[in-house]
Swiss-Prot record:
Keywords: Acetylation, Cytoplasm, Metal-binding, Transferase, Ubl conjugation pathway, Zinc, Zinc-finger. A zinc finger (RING-Gid-type) spans 338-379. Its EC number is 2.3.2.27. This is E3 ubiquitin-protein transferase RMND5B. GO terms for molecular function: ubiquitin protein ligase activity; zinc ion binding. It catalyses: S-ubiquitinyl-[E2 ubiquitin-conjugating enzyme]-L-cysteine + [acceptor protein]-L-lysine = [E2 ubiquitin-conjugating enzyme]-L-cysteine + N(6)-ubiquitinyl-[acceptor protein]-L-lysine. The modification N-acetylmethionine is found at residue 1. It comes from the Eukaryota. It holds the Pfam family zf-RING_UBOX.
């Protein structure tokens, strides 16, 4: 993070110079335009009177040309000074970040096998669909000859259609979707449908007294949600008292906050993804975010390993030389460490539950077998190794 902070400081300096230069540029050009405008008015007045160009006006015109030239040269000179600041940002990036990252990953990651290429392409396509960049995703599918089923595309197409409508403050498609999936949303304890009805009611309130009767009529949609959202419904109904005076100057002015639209987009995305079995963030974006956290740590440990000449510590297999804390946001499943070998289990070495209930790794189980029998390391029970069952957390 220190490296990012160093680059950010240089970037802030450049942005401040750009801002100052822009303001100075604007002032200089406005003054120049005003000066030229005055001179033009004097010349027009002299032309109307039919008088020849006086020596004074000729001198003023020469001064005007010189002033324009000096101003342009000064602005160009100031602009050149900014170039050095921009180049310092590039130097700060080169100084604080190592561009050579191949040493922190296994060579197999860059293997050009067709299967791995398809997995990466599919991750990119899914990310593009989830971001609403449908045409780009289709173009990538055509160029990479990747076959994507319509069943895979359909949820993303529907999600993006509804989100586009919400961004345009059109609640119709979202309400229609929520009503058609009401039962499944209730199973998820989702309040999406209520929030959509509430936002529609607030839009009617924003219409003022002319929409009062329509708002009262629409309030009937709150009846199914009265038990769970009684307090919020009471607040909305109470706001009707201030409708003629203006909600923006009432205790209910918070109802008109524009942040409700951003909130409904987030709620819809989260609940719709849960209902459709999709992740809120694409696997590609999660992997990228995790990599941004892990890469600086891995670069540091790589430098330490090379400095101490103990390269055998990191053999580029399925585990890292140190644990990297990615935060709770990146926790998707539990992790089991074998209490015998003190190693984290993996797909090739999964956790095994013994008959007695104790859990060890498969590698530990194989090492404990003696004469075709297995004695639990934690209790006196002896058992057949084949009776062990794999556990999936």
């Amino acid at each position: 993070m220190e490296q990012c902070a160093c680059v950010e400081r240089e970037l802030d300096k450049v942005l401040q110079k750009f801002l100052t230069y822009g303001q100075h540029c604007e002032r200089s050009l406005e003054e120049l335009l005003h000066y030229v405008g005055q001179l033009r008015a004097e010349l027009a007045s002299a032309a109307l009177q039919g008088t020849p160009l006086s020596a004074t006006l000729s001198l003023v015109m020469s001064q005007c040309c010189r002033k324009i030239k000096d101003t342009v040269q000064k602005l160009a000179s100031d602009h050149k000074d900014i170039h050095s600041s921009v180049s310092r940002v590039g130097k700060a990036i080169d100084r604080n970040f190592d561009s050579e990252i191949c040493g922190v990953v296994s060579d197999a990651v860059w293997d050009a096998r067709e299967q791995q290429q398809q997995i990466l392409q599919m991750a990119i396509v899914e990310h593009l669909y989830q971001q609403g960049m449908l045409s780009v995703a289709e173009e990538l599918c055509q160029e990479s000859t990747l076959n994507v089923d319509l069943d895979f595309k359909q949820p993303f197409l529907e999600l993006n259609r509804i989100l586009e409508a919400l961004h345009e403050q059109d609640l119709g498609p979202a309400l229609e979707w929520a009503v058609s999936h009401r039962q499944r949303l209730l199973e998820l304890n989702s309040s999406l449908e209520f929030k959509l009805h509430r936002l529609h009611f607030i839009r009617l309130l924003a219409g003022g007294p002319a929409k009062q009767l329509e708002a009262l009529s629409y309030a009937r949609h709150f009846q199914p949600f009265a038990r769970l959202h009684q307090r919020e419904i009471q607040v909305m109904m109470g706001s009707l008292v201030y409708l003629r005076l203006g909600l923006e100057k009432s205790p209910y002015c918070h109802l008109l906050d524009s942040s409700h639209w951003a909130e409904i987009c987030e709620t819809f995305t989260r609940d719709a993804c849960s209902l459709l079995g999709l992740s809120v963030e694409s696997p590609l974006s999660v992997s990228f975010a995790s990599g941004c956290v892990a890469l600086p740590v891995l670069m540091n440990i790589k430098a330490v390993i090379e400095q101490r000449q103990c390269t055998g510590v990191w053999n580029h297999k399925d585990e890292l030389p140190i644990e990297i804390e990615l935060g709770m946001k990146c926790w998707y499943h539990s992790v089991f460490a074998c209490p015998i070998l003190r190693q984290q289990t993996s797909d090739s070495n999964p956790p095994i539950k013994l008959i007695c209930g104790h859990v060890i790794s498969r590698d530990a189980l194989n090492k404990l077998i003696n004469g075709g029998k297995l004695k639990c390391p934690y209790c006196p029970m002896e058992q057949n190794p084949a009776d062990g069952k794999r556990i999936i957390f």
